[in-house]
Design a protein with these regions (language model features):
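A donor-sugar binding/catalytic signature common to diverse glycosyltransferases
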Residues: 93-117, 121, 287-330
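Extended catalytic core of nucleotide-activated donor transferases of GT-like folds
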Residues: 40, 69-135
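Conserved catalytic-core segment of nucleotide-activated headgroup transferases in glycan assembly
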Residues: 36-44, 182-183, 190-273, 345-347, ...
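C-terminal amphipathic helix plus adjacent low-complexity
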Residues: 1-3, 12, 19, 23, ...
Length: 398
């Protein structure tokens, strides 16, 4: 039995003595490892605008804890006695990535689970795939009966709730509702209220103070943010133009910098990052994705839904489709080529040509208002307020 499971035994015992308290909300993200995504932005919104609510971020990393303490943001280390008491009293458990964002948040009377999804539906999500498909994708062996029982026990001790316990999830437009529904059972509500993390894209003063790449002020910034391969079990995305000194020289001469940011799920497969004067790998810099896209003049991706967030900035988008993700990986719910939100390329030469075209005629390649409104019902930076209202007055947001 590992450490978390042992602590889980203690947490289960402690929970007997604490009832849920109204207006006590806890937040977590990224399996307890980082402070970002929707939980970050909704928590800070709550602290500023609704101080009558008792809110606290739960983390499993001491670096995150120290960072938040310095910022004056309520935070506790997940495995401490103080955090276990905080969690035991929480009315709302709010998370962004997995149920493992916060340990020991067991089901109990009066408790609510709110999942701030970390992306809009495009590629097929785990919840829409069979366990057998996921096992094959990841190259895993079939679990034995004994292992399955151990996993169930671990879930009971450390997590204590399931996907069906989620009260609702949100989408950014009505177009996306039917695809989000493919990922959740009918008892999970779907509300078109936006994403809390996108409010930051409307907050220029805030973004000036967020951590960002040093030494690139005044550069024309192109950020490449591909999605994961096989949910972290696939081959890492190669850095474009790593073996093209001609392209690197052109970028340098024209004041262009290409930032390479692999998907967080692939982080364990990123061993040797490649950086040059005009190409910088930022994968391991622990940068907030919203900060990355805010400071980018052009976003390059493939099947990550980050481009939907980026539409709010009304800047050019390039889809660099370099492999057979659609047929040999998880695939997608719909074909974005049928109503393209940006430009498409399939090899480095075409990618380079698009960079030159956009640099020379930037405004020509901005997304249309029609495309923006297809993926965003609201373009106002008020998603956190809508989320607050959806949680506190749910009948008004069915």
């Amino acid at each position: 039995m590992n450490r978390n499971n042992i602590i889980g035994l203690f947490a289960r015992f402690i929970n007997v003595f604490y009832r849920v308290k109204k207006q006590h909300w806890i937040f977590g993200a990224d399996n307890g490892l980082t402070y970002r995504e929707g939980s970050k932005y909704l928590l800070e919104y709550m602290v500023t605008n609704h101080p009558e609510y008792h809110c606290c971020f739960i983390t499993q990393r001491h670096e995150v804890y120290e960072e938040l303490v310095k910022k004056g943001i309520p935070c506790k280390m997940n495995n401490t006695y103080g955090a276990i008491k905080e969690i035991a009293r929480a009315e709302c458990v709010i998370f962004t990535h997995t149920r493992g964002d916060i340990h020991y948040a067991y089901k109990k009377q009066g408790r609510r689970y709110i999942y701030l999804v970390h992306g809009m539906p495009l590629k097929r999500a785990k919840k829409a795939l069979s366990k057998e498909t996921m096992r094959i994708l990841k190259g895993q062996k079939k679990a034995s009966w004994l292992k399955k029982q151990r996993m169930k026990l671990a879930n009971w001790l450390t997590t204590g709730h399931n996907a069906k316990d989620i009260e609702f999830v949100s989408v950014t437009s009505d177009f996306l509702v039917k695809y989000m529904r493919l990922q959740y059972s009918e008892n999970v509500g779907i509300k078109t209220i936006g994403m809390p993390r996108n409010d930051a894209l409307f907050q220029s003063e805030r973004m000036k103070n967020e951590k960002w790449v040093k030494g690139i002020d005044g550069k024309f910034v192109i950020t490449y943010m591909p999605t994961h391969r096989k949910y972290g079990a696939g081959v890492i995305t190669p850095t474009p133009f790593a073996n093209r000194p001609d392209v690197q020289n052109w970028l340098e001469d024209n004041g262009v910098v290409l930032l390479m940011k692999n998907h967080p799920t692939m982080l364990n497969r990123v061993h040797n990052t490649q950086s040059y004067s005009s190409i910088i790998d930022i994968t391991k810099m622990s940068l907030d994705p919203q900060v990355c896209i805010y400071h980018s003049d052009v976003l390059v991706t493939d099947f990550s839904s980050v481009w939907m967030d980026y539409l709010l900035l009304r800047r050019p988008i390039v889809f660099y489709i370099y492999d057979d993700f659609e047929t040999e990986d998880v695939g997608t719910y719909y074909d974005i080529r049928e109503d393209p939100p940006g430009l498409f390329c399939y090899n480095e030469d075409d990618f380079f040509q698009l960079i030159k075209q956009i640099k020379n005629d930037y405004d020509k390649f901005r997304p249309s208002d029609r495309i923006i409104h297809k993926y965003h019902k609201f373009i106002d930076g008020n998603s956190c307020e809508r989320y607050f209202q959806a949680i506190t007055t749910p009948d008004n947001y069915t």
